[in-house]
Amino acid sequence: MWSLALTLPSPSLVSVRSTKLGRSVSNGGRNWSGLTKLSEKSKTKRGNGLCCKAELSELAPVVSATYGVLLLGGGLFAYSKSGSKGSLFGGLTGSVLMASAYFLTKSPETRVLGDTIGLGAAFLFSSVFGFRLASSRKPVPAGPLLLLSIGMLSFFVMAYMHDSLPAISIPDPLPLP
């Protein structure tokens, strides 16, 4: 009988590798890289990363279109699943209201009207899903839809207040002598 033994070198406990910050020494699972260099680098150069600098008035058309598509999709899904004409009518109504809010919020002259229509539609669907949740006592599908509608309602309230209320000017404090 033949036997073949293959000997492999055992891994060392200390390994050294090169990184962008210099040499990194790893000892038994502990990484002792140039931590001072990393902290200095993070203090000197701040990356932009994922940063959204959009205002509510710029986000309102996207939010209203997304909410309208979700309402239409939910109405079509409920109609195909259970034949509910009420859900189909609600989905179509919500998508038409959100489409009008979408087109109105794209123009600065009609932005407040679009916010108002979005606010009214979100309030309407929050009420509908709240009543459905209270009457059926089943958390699905009325619960998540209620949370989504409350989120849209709060968004459109903030967008309406942002677009319709005038900016508050704070007077400069008295100069010190």
Curated annotation (Swiss-Prot):
Keyword annotations = Chloroplast, Membrane, Plastid, Transit peptide, Transmembrane, Transmembrane helix
Q: List all membrane-crossing ranges.
A: 85-105, 111-131, 140-160
**Location, primary (coarse class):** plastid
What do the Gene Ontology cellular component annotations say? chloroplast membrane
Q: What else is known?
A: For all TMEM14 proteins, 4 hydrophobic alpha-helical domains are predicted. However, NMR structure determination of the human TMEM14A showed that only 3 of these helices are membrane-spaning while the amphiphilic N-terminal helix is probably located at the lipid micelle-water interface.
Task: Spell out the PANTHER family in the cross-references.
Answer: PROTEIN FATTY ACID EXPORT 4, CHLOROPLASTIC (PTHR12668:SF38), TRANSMEMBRANE PROTEIN 14, 15 (PTHR12668)
Q: Which family does it belong to?
A: Belongs to the TMEM14 family.
Instruction: Please report the name of this protein according to its UniProt entry.
Output: Protein FATTY ACID EXPORT 4, chloroplastic
State the species of origin. Arabidopsis thaliana
